[in-house]
Amino acid sequence: MAQVRGGVGEMLGTLFERHHVALFNFFYKLTGQRAMSEDLVQDVFFRILKYRQSYRPGTGFRAWMYQIARNARVDLLRRQHPEISWEPEMSPAFVPEDQPQQDQQAFLLRTALLELPEEKREVLVLSRFQDLKYEQIAEILGCELSTVKVKVHRALHELRDIFQKLEAGKLLRKAGPQGPGIRPGSGSVQ
């Protein structure tokens, strides 16, 4: 980043190669929308170049980059109407039964993550999917380390509750309205 800050624009390509996948995953886990995530990644790297002089050498680049990412996302939300649709590209109402168990679990986890309130989803994505340290997250969010720990704990608890409800709903849909093992209309056990 020091070379980009010093005016060596070619080094931005190196930063892009190093960080664009992580940024895309960050945005995609927050929004569930592929095209929006790609646009936001481009916007972040444009801003890194534009605001390169604001980077303080010796501070964590990743924390600075994720702060820019948060700002880019907030700016996008402000530009759009207040009731932006954050519907994921895959419907959570249907979990394909022919998927392997691990794929179904991953689908339910993604769905549960998108069901979390935005603030809780963001802190989980930063800590669990982007592997940032709590100290870095505190810097990004502008809060105390202890606050980050509490937020992560509460977000994990709520994620677990949502996941369990989704999993229970999947089992109910699989069993049907009569319950497991009962054929509709026959009263006999299958």
Positions of PLM-derived features:
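Hydrophobic-face residues of short alpha-helical interaction/recognition segments
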Residues: 23, 27, 52, 65, ...
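N-terminal module of bacterial RNA polymerase sigma factors
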Residues: 1-22, 114, 176-190
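C-terminal edge and immediately downstream basic/flexible tail or linker adjoining helix-turn-helix-like DNA-binding
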Residues: 3, 87, 108, 139-142, ...
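DNA-recognition helix of helix-turn-helix
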Residues: 70, 74, 120, 141-168
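Internal acidic/polar
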Residues: 75, 82-106, 177-187
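Sigma70-family region 2
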Residues: 5-6, 32, 43-60, 79-81
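Short, charged helix-capping/linker segments at alpha-helix termini
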Residues: 3-14, 24-43, 145
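A short pre-motif secondary-structure segment
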Residues: 123-127
